[in-house]
């Protein structure tokens, strides 16, 4: 939970900040962020799309420069988006490994973070035979599970909101849950207080 998420003070509303969407690969983060943009009026920003637009496809970046180079690009993009006032009302989707970068993790501790939780049964049909995700090679199912187990604790620690994305829940349900949780957290009345205990959003 992010105890440092800024609260309103002196009766004034808290400054608008992006909502950062985290979770494992193939969870559907980008799809949910795009849905929130279309139906709730948020700006849509996707860290991977920013990187691809500037540097080319991610699999090629990994092949030519290695994972550390990609993580440095990723950290730079996250920091850039979070400090850009033009993205103050965005749903900002970041890659599955981004919260594992120490600099990114520290930034996210003071942001409103939503964790899209899924399981292997939900994700497996999306990644079977996928050759475009370098971190999942050569065995996508096994690698996904390994990465998820390694990263899950970090996701849970950072989350102000947890969304249950298992069983292929419709994106409309997830979006409605997310919007309700955002409204709840942004309307907290007490200055300097931590957010309420994160609630798992379920249909």
Walk through the language-model features, giving the residues of each.
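Hydrophobic anchor at the beta1->P-loop junction of P-loop NTPases
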Residues: 21
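ATP-dependent small-molecule kinase phosphotransfer cores
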Residues: 46-107, 141
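NTP-dependent small-molecule kinase module
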Residues: 2-14, 39, 153-203
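Hydrophobic positions on the alpha1 helix immediately C-terminal to the Walker A/P-loop
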Residues: 32
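A glycine- and Lys/Arg-enriched "phosphate-lid" helix/loop adjacent to the NTP-binding pocket
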Residues: 112-154
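Post-Walker A helix-loop "phosphate-sensing" segment adjacent to the P-loop in P-loop NTPases
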Residues: 38-47
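Conserved lysine of the Walker
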Residues: 29
């Amino acid at each position: 939970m992010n105890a440092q998420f800024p609260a309103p003070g002196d009766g004034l509303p808290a400054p608008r900040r992006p909502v950062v969407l985290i979770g494992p690969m193939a969870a559907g983060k980008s799809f949910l962020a795009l849905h929130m943009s279309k139906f709730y009026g948020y700006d849509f920003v996707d860290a991977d799309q920013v990187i691809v637009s500037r540097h080319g496809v991610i699999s090629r970046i990994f092949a030519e420069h290695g994972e550390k180079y990609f993580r440095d690009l990723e950290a730079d993009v996250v920091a850039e988006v979070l400090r850009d006032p033009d993205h103050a009302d965005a749903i900002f989707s970041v890659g599955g490994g981004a919260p594992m970068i120490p600099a990114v993790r520290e930034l996210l501790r003071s942001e409103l973070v939503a964790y899209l939780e899924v399981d292997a049964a939900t994700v497996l049909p999306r990644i079977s035979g996928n050759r475009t995700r370098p971190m999942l090679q050569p065995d996508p199912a096994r690698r996904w599970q390994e990465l998820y187990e390694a990263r899950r604790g970090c996701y849970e620690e950072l989350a102000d909101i947890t969304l249950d994305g298992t069983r292929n829940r419709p994106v409309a349900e997830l979006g409605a849950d997310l919007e309700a949780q955002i409204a709840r957290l942004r309307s907290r009345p007490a200055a300097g207080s931590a957010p309420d205990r994160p609630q798992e959003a379920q249909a």
